Amino acid sequence: SIKDRNVLQIQTLKRNNWNVTRVFAVNYYNNPKREIKRIKDLLDRITGRDKKTGSGIAKAQKAYKCANVSQLFETADYVTSGDNDAEIVSRLKAIVGAEEPISENFLIRRTLSTLGILKFGNKVENRMLALIPLCGFKREKLLGEFYYRKTDKPVTFDKYRVETGEKAVRRYETDFTPYEIIALIKAALEDKVALYTEEIASVACAALRLQKVTDKFAAYINDCVTLGEERGLFVRSVSDRISLA
């Protein structure tokens, strides 16, 4: 069937460590030089002779834009008293507007940090969880975590963000959204064609300017790869090599 020929056969080859590319007869007939060059470029990437290695990673990168909010130095009572809800909601909206998409956990920590509250307990967290729905954000649940955004525009897996300042605001694995991690993986695979999951973790760690690949970060990368497989973006071979679908 058409599905066997165009989908299942190709996925089977990729799962068995084949590097697969399509050459359509009509494209070759109309422009054979272009198609031959495309195949040569693919072979150069596979053999490591491509001088443009890393271009996909660079192209998919953009700067992380932090919200412009004033820094306060308050205590936990500022949040739990209920007297400052309007100010807290305003900060939540400003942060999501500038830094979307953003995980629920990071949104809470990020907002509290602008209030000078770096350590907090369940009472403060529950109050923040009660205020977030008042903002009217759009949200999507991925890998067990809610990710918020201000706009209705669907989030794509095309760009990942890198912080340019000396002090990074993102510290934990879910601070880097699955949208960004999948975009980074796609870019890496455009450069390298196929990679093992541990190689992807190393590439991601370097691209995001993290000090080292922790066990939690490696597990998170693997979860994002699995999500990419479910979305039809990646194919995992029997030897655990990942390639673009």
Task: Cite the ranges covered by each PLM segment.
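C-terminal non-catalytic scaffold/interaction domains in large multidomain proteins
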Residues: 53-245
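Non-catalytic C-terminal interaction segments of nucleic acid-processing enzymes
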Residues: 37-59
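Basic, low-complexity terminal or inter-domain segments flanking catalytic cores
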Residues: 27, 32, 46, 210-215
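Basic, amphipathic alpha-helical patches used to engage nucleic acids or provide basic targeting signals
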Residues: 1-42
